Each structure stands twice: as structure tokens, then as C-alpha cells.
């Protein structure tokens, strides 16, 4: 076990500390959680960031997409997670339909911040720049989600790898820079070629978190039910079962943190 995991974290994770991690080349770990007990365990295991994802619609509520999730759903689970986490950085998804206008986005983001979120995550490209600016100017930190954005599943025609053409890759790069200029603090990259994940991470100052975006992102994220192998159905390529060789979920969580920190996850078989 690495010395990182042997030492309990005493200081709260912050946006400046996450940026400092990118600058010194230390990988950031993020996992999803939906209740206080899992949040507390992840915090104890050294996970830097906990995401209350709209993935709760699929893994908790049993829907076949994230689209039915409401702002009230996310706020409820955010409050649960915030009570359990002591030092990890807590971030919440803005669910489908909750940020159609910048004013509506602010109103709903406030609900999540009041529930305990320290940052909100929104999906979308250049057209979200005004919303990002509107939120950050009003003291709400924002992570922007590019690549495979699940709320756009019907437009994509399914869950497909994005950014595979030179044109699509260049568009994503320009959008990342535009959103950073608008005030975005972090960038989540999902299901894109590993080479593009590397280029985007080098291009922007803000930390990047990857899920199926290669090993060169500033950090990685997985969904709770995926890394402990309890979500039924076909597993995405970027998922690894960290329960293998472990006797507890805590052990699996520590194994995930160690694998991200030492660069062994994601491996080539988890990348596009």
C-alpha cells in the first residue's frame, strides 16, 4: 500500500489544491456516491472528489437513462453525501432540463450548493459558455462535461465514443478553451480517444477528469456500482472491477485510489 493511503487526510480538498495536484503531476481520484455511508468510506480511503451523479437515475432508481432525474433527486442525495464526507470535495450533477437558461441554472445550482455541493457539473459545449460565466460570476464553481454526454444520448443515437475525427477533436479543443475562459474550474472528459484526452489535458490549465478518456487526464472517475461490480448488464470498456482480489468494498476503493495514483488504471484495455 502506498504511503499516500497510509496517511489520513487532515485538510479539506479545495479547488486550489486540486489545481496544485495537476501542476505537480499527482493524479486526482473521483468516485460517485449517493449516501452518507459510502461518502464517509470514500473520504477515509483518500478519494479527493465525490460526485453525486445523475447516474443515480440508473443505478439507484432503475431507469434506463439519466434523463428522468430531477433537481430534487440530486439535492437529496447531495445532502446525504455532504453529511458523510469530511474532507473530500463534493460535486453534484445538474440533471437534464435543470439548466435550459442561465437564470434557471443559477436557481437550481443554488439548491445543490445549499444541499452541500461545492461545485456543479453541466454537460455541453460552446453554447454553455454564457451559463458557465453566469454561474461562476455568482460564486458557483462549475465543471464542464465534454465528449460522451449522457443527457444527449438520443442525439448521439446511443452511448458512442466521441471526438474520433480530426474535425470533432478540434471542435472539442476550441470548446474546452472557450469554457475555461468563461470561468469553468474543471473539465470532465468521457469516452474519447486517449490521445485526445492527453491533448486536452495539456491544452487547458484546469484539471481534467477522465472516464474512458485515457491515462493522461489529471484524474479519473468511476461510478460506484461499476467499480464494485454490482450494476447488471454490459459493462462499458472503461470500467474495471476493483472487487477482484478484495474482501471488502473499502479494499476495492483503496485499490482504485492506488491504481489511479500509480498510473496502472486506466490500462490500455480501458481506453479508446
UniProtKB/Swiss-Prot annotation:
Binding residues annotated for Mg(2+), in chain numbering: 54, 93, 123
Main subcellular location of this protein, as a coarse class: cytoplasm
Catalytic reactions of this protein: 3-methyl-2-oxobutanoate + (6R)-5,10-methylene-5,6,7,8-tetrahydrofolate + H2O = 2-dehydropantoate + (6S)-5,6,7,8-tetrahydrofolate
Transmembrane segments: none
Gene3D superfamilies attached to this UniProt entry: Phosphoenolpyruvate-binding domains (3.20.20.60)
Record: residues binding 3-methyl-2-oxobutanoate: 54-55, 93, 121
One Gene Ontology biological process: pantothenate biosynthetic process
Annotated organism of origin: Janthinobacterium sp. (strain Marseille) (Minibacterium massiliensis)
GO cellular component: cytoplasm
Cofactor(s) of this protein: Mg(2+)
Entries under InterPro entries matching the protein: Pantoate_hydroxy_MeTrfase (IPR003700), Pyrv/PenolPyrv_kinase-like_dom (IPR015813), Pyrv_kinase-like_dom_sf (IPR040442)
Subunit relationships: Homodecamer; pentamer of dimers.
Enzyme's top EC category: transferase
Keywords: Cytoplasm, Magnesium, Metal-binding, Pantothenate biosynthesis, Transferase
Listed EC numbers: 2.1.2.11
Pathway involvement of the protein, from the record: Cofactor biosynthesis; (R)-pantothenate biosynthesis; (R)-pantoate from 3-methyl-2-oxobutanoate: step 1/2
Catalytic machinery residues: 190 (proton acceptor)
One Pfam assignment: Pantoate_transf
Cell compartments where the protein resides: Cytoplasm
Protein's UniProt name: 3-methyl-2-oxobutanoate hydroxymethyltransferase
Amino acid at each position: 500500500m502506498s504511503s499516500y493511503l497510509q496517511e489520513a487526510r487532515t485538510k479539506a480538498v479545495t479547488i486550489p489544491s486540486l489545481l496544485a495536484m495537476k501542476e505537480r503531476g499527482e493524479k486526482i481520484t473521483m468516485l460517485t456516491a449517493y449516501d452518507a455511508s459510502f461518502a464517509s468510506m470514500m473520504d477515509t480511503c483518500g478519494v479527493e472528489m465525490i460526485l453525486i451523479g445523475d447516474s443515480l437515475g440508473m443505478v439507484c432508481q432503475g431507469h434506463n437513462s439519466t434523463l428522468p432525474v430531477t433537481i430534487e433527486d440530486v439535492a437529496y442525495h447531495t445532502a446525504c453525501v455532504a453529511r458523510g464526507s469530511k474532507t473530500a470535495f463534493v460535486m453534484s450533477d445538474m440533471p437534464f432540463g435543470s439548466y435550459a437558461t442561465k437564470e434557471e441554472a443559477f436557481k437550481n445550482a443554488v439548491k445543490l450548493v445549499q444541499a452541500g455541493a461545492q461545485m456543479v457539473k453541466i454537460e455541453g459545449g460552446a453554447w454553455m459558455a454564457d451559463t458557465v460565466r453566469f454561474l461562476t460570476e455568482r460564486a458557483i464553481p462549475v465543471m464542464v462535461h465534454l465528449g460522451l454526454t449522457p443527457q444527449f444520448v438520443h442525439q448521439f443515437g446511443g452511448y458512442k465514443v466521441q471526438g474520433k475525427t480530426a474535425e470533432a477533436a478540434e471542435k472539442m479543443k476550441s470548446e474546452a478553451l472557450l469554457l475555461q475562459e468563461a470561468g469553468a474550474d474543471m473539465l470532465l472528459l468521457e469516452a474519447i480517444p486517449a490521445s485526445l484526452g492527453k491533448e486536452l489535458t495539456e491544452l487547458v490549465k484546469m484539471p481534467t477528469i477522465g472516464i474512458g478518456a485515457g491515462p493522461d487526464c489529471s484524474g479519473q472517475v468511476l461510478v460506484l456500482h461499476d467499480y464494485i461490480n454490482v450494476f447488471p448488464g454490459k459493462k462499458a470498456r472503461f470500467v474495471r472491477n476493483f472487487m477482484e482480489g478484495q474482501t471488502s468494498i473499502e479494499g476495492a476503493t483503496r485499490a482504485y485510489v492506488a491504481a489511479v495514483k500509480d498510473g496502472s488504471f486506466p490500462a490500455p484495455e480501458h481506453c479508446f
